């Protein structure tokens, strides 16, 4: 009974997916399908409280529900709820089937919940594939648009290659240690010394997970996929998907710490290069979705700093940064979603689509401005708190060159974030683009982005509740 209660959020999401599938087979109705999805996700989010009271509990040898799993589950469900709500506004004017989007979204969310609870390589692979496969369909959902079809196929092919690296790395680890559980791997790695096959296995696993996190040099797919995919699907890929992978990587490194100096140094170099490459490549972008893609690369470079340090504050720092990143990313992509719709061609992602937005959509302009400031790490926004923690753990560990990389990357990023903000307030152009819904503020999507903007500001001014909650969850 305890195990069932601990897994109740995952069970509810899976049950909702089944109900939605049966509903689609019975009767196609966009409003009904979206409502069932949102109700099921809200029930799953409420069930996280029940799961927390049961934690920590081992659910079979494959999964464990502890504070970190509940924390990741909350973030994934919040991001999925936002994507479902924003997707409703986005798909309202779409031609053809719309209901399957919610089914794919629920299946991907179930994969994310399974992934953050995994403590075994088999569960890790199962959760990762359950998360990735629905994304193939979501990214190519508006298949009449050439860019969406290209994004879906590109992500599918490269993701399959990354999964092959991941599987081969798992095979090498199992052949040398006889263990697939994280704890057993940790003990074997601690006593193995500098075994080359073990390090090769860990390295190949890092390649597979690094692809999912867009770590340099496995990042080249990111801007193309973000640009071509439908805005709600890109939102999920940039938020919930990366949260799940980052948290399972954190759990893996905590259970199976990297002892060899060269592999530890490799992680540090990857963090440094990812920070700088992501920010430098974003400087020349004129497409907001591509810009946010490169920005995402840079932010996961910052997050790698916490994983490299891997001291007492590493988990807390990574979790805190994930909260600020998810809120900000959902808000930024939410504005893109509300200004886009399949009935007016490709998404409103070019910067010239946002020229003079202040004069016709002042509230959306305010939201996007807040999100850009938070991504840049400006004080009085949630993004500043996350970046402060990253710098603090780097200083505490005397990783001065990584701290320098964070500071330099943030300085470079400030330029292109300000460039977006300036565009919003330029004189209005003669040609206006058709937006998704005219009375957006009366709809749930507008409420979502306004609520996210308010949270980003409030948590930036008064971060104590967020810090206490993260510390409580990670410690539990």
UniProtKB/Swiss-Prot annotation:
<protein>
    <recommendedName>
        <fullName>NADH-quinone oxidoreductase subunit N</fullName>
        <ecNumber>7.1.1.-</ecNumber>
    </recommendedName>
</protein>
<feature type="transmembrane region" description="Helical">
    <location>
        <begin position="447"/>
        <end position="467"/>
    </location>
</feature>
<feature type="transmembrane region" description="Helical">
    <location>
        <begin position="406"/>
        <end position="426"/>
    </location>
</feature>
<feature type="transmembrane region" description="Helical">
    <location>
        <begin position="121"/>
        <end position="141"/>
    </location>
</feature>
<feature type="transmembrane region" description="Helical">
    <location>
        <begin position="263"/>
        <end position="283"/>
    </location>
</feature>
<keyword id="KW-0472">Membrane</keyword>
<feature type="transmembrane region" description="Helical">
    <location>
        <begin position="4"/>
        <end position="24"/>
    </location>
</feature>
<keyword id="KW-0997">Cell inner membrane</keyword>
<feature type="transmembrane region" description="Helical">
    <location>
        <begin position="230"/>
        <end position="250"/>
    </location>
</feature>
<keyword id="KW-1133">Transmembrane helix</keyword>
<comment type="function">
    <text>NDH-1 shuttles electrons from NADH, via FMN and iron-sulfur (Fe-S) centers, to quinones in the respiratory chain. The immediate electron acceptor for the enzyme in this species is believed to be ubiquinone. Couples the redox reaction to proton translocation (for every two electrons transferred, four hydrogen ions are translocated across the cytoplasmic membrane), and thus conserves the redox energy in a proton gradient.</text>
</comment>
<feature type="transmembrane region" description="Helical">
    <location>
        <begin position="155"/>
        <end position="175"/>
    </location>
</feature>
<dbReference type="InterPro" id="IPR010096">
    <property type="entry name" value="NADH-Q_OxRdtase_suN/2"/>
</dbReference>
<dbReference type="GO" id="GO:0050136">
    <property type="term" value="F:NADH:ubiquinone reductase (non-electrogenic) activity"/>
</dbReference>
<keyword id="KW-0813">Transport</keyword>
<dbReference type="Pfam" id="PF00361">
    <property type="entry name" value="Proton_antipo_M"/>
</dbReference>
<dbReference type="GO" id="GO:0005886">
    <property type="term" value="C:plasma membrane"/>
</dbReference>
<feature type="transmembrane region" description="Helical">
    <location>
        <begin position="67"/>
        <end position="87"/>
    </location>
</feature>
<keyword id="KW-1003">Cell membrane</keyword>
<feature type="transmembrane region" description="Helical">
    <location>
        <begin position="198"/>
        <end position="218"/>
    </location>
</feature>
<dbReference type="GO" id="GO:0042773">
    <property type="term" value="P:ATP synthesis coupled electron transport"/>
</dbReference>
<feature type="transmembrane region" description="Helical">
    <location>
        <begin position="366"/>
        <end position="386"/>
    </location>
</feature>
<feature type="transmembrane region" description="Helical">
    <location>
        <begin position="291"/>
        <end position="311"/>
    </location>
</feature>
<feature type="transmembrane region" description="Helical">
    <location>
        <begin position="100"/>
        <end position="117"/>
    </location>
</feature>
<comment type="subunit">
    <text>NDH-1 is composed of 14 different subunits. Subunits NuoA, H, J, K, L, M, N constitute the membrane sector of the complex.</text>
</comment>
<keyword id="KW-0874">Quinone</keyword>
<keyword id="KW-1278">Translocase</keyword>
<feature type="transmembrane region" description="Helical">
    <location>
        <begin position="32"/>
        <end position="52"/>
    </location>
</feature>
<dbReference type="GO" id="GO:0048038">
    <property type="term" value="F:quinone binding"/>
</dbReference>
<keyword id="KW-0812">Transmembrane</keyword>
<comment type="similarity">
    <text>Belongs to the complex I subunit 2 family.</text>
</comment>
<keyword id="KW-0520">NAD</keyword>
<dbReference type="GO" id="GO:0008137">
    <property type="term" value="F:NADH dehydrogenase (ubiquinone) activity"/>
</dbReference>
<keyword id="KW-0830">Ubiquinone</keyword>
<dbReference type="InterPro" id="IPR001750">
    <property type="entry name" value="ND/Mrp_TM"/>
</dbReference>
<feature type="transmembrane region" description="Helical">
    <location>
        <begin position="319"/>
        <end position="339"/>
    </location>
</feature>
């Amino acid at each position: 009974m305890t195990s069932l209660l601990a897994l109740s959020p995952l069970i509810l999401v899976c049950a909702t997916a089944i109900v939605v599938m049966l509903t689609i087979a019975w009767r196609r109705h966009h409003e009904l399908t979206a409502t069932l999805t949102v109700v099921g996700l809200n029930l799953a989010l409420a069930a996280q409280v029940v799961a927390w009271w049961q934690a920590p509990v081992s659910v079979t040898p494959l999964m464990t529900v502890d504070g970190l799993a509940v924390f990741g589950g909350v973030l994934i469900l919040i991001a999925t709820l936002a994507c479902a709500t924003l997707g409703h506004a986005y798909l309202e004017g779409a031609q053809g089937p719309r209901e399957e989007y919610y089914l794919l979204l629920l299946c991907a969310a179930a994969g994310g919940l399974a992934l953050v609870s995994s403590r075994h390589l088999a569960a890790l692979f199962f959760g990762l594939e359950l998360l990735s496969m629905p994304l193939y369909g979501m990214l190519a959902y508006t298949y009449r648009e050439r860019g969406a079809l290209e994004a879906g196929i590109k992500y599918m092919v490269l993701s399959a290659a990354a999964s092959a690296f991941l599987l081969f790395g798992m095979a090498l680890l199992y052949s040398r240690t006889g263990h697939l559980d994280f704890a057993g791997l940790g003990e074997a790695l601690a006593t193995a010394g500098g075994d080359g096959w073990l390090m090769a296995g860990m390295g190949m696993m890092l390649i597979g997970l690094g692809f999912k996190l867009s770590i340099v040099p496995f990042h080249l797919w990111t801007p193309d996929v973000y640009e071509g995919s439908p805005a709600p699907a890109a939102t999920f890929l940039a938020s919930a998907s990366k949260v799940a992978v980052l948290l399972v990587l954190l759990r893996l490194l905590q259970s199976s710490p990297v002892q060899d100096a060269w592999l530890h140094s490799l992680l540090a170099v990857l963090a440094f290069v990812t920070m700088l490459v992501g920010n430098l490549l974003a400087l020349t972008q004129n497409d907001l979705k591509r810009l946010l893609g490169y920005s995402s690369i840079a932010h996961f470079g910052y997050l790698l700093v916490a994983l490299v340090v891997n001291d007492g504050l590493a988990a807390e720092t990574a979790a805190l940064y994930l909260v600020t990143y998810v809120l900000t990313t959902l808000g930024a992509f939410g504005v893109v979603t509300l200004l886009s719709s399949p009935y007016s061609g490709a998404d409103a992602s070019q910067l010239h689509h946002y020229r003079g937005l202040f004069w016709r959509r002042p509230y959306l302009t305010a939201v996007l401005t807040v999100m850009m400031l938070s991504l840049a790490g400006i004080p009085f926004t949630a993004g500043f708190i996350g970046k402060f923690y990253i710098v603090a753990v780097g200083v505490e560990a005397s990783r001065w060159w990584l701290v320098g990389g964070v500071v330099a990357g943030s300085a470079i990023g400030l330029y292109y974030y300000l460039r977006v903000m300036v565009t919003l307030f330029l004189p209005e152009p003669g040609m206006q683009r058709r937006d998704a819904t005219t009375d957006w503020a009366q709809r749930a999507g507008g409420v979502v982005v306004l609520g996210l903007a308010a949270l980003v500001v409030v948590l930036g001014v008064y971060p104590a509740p967020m810090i206490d909650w993260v510390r409580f969850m990670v410690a539990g």
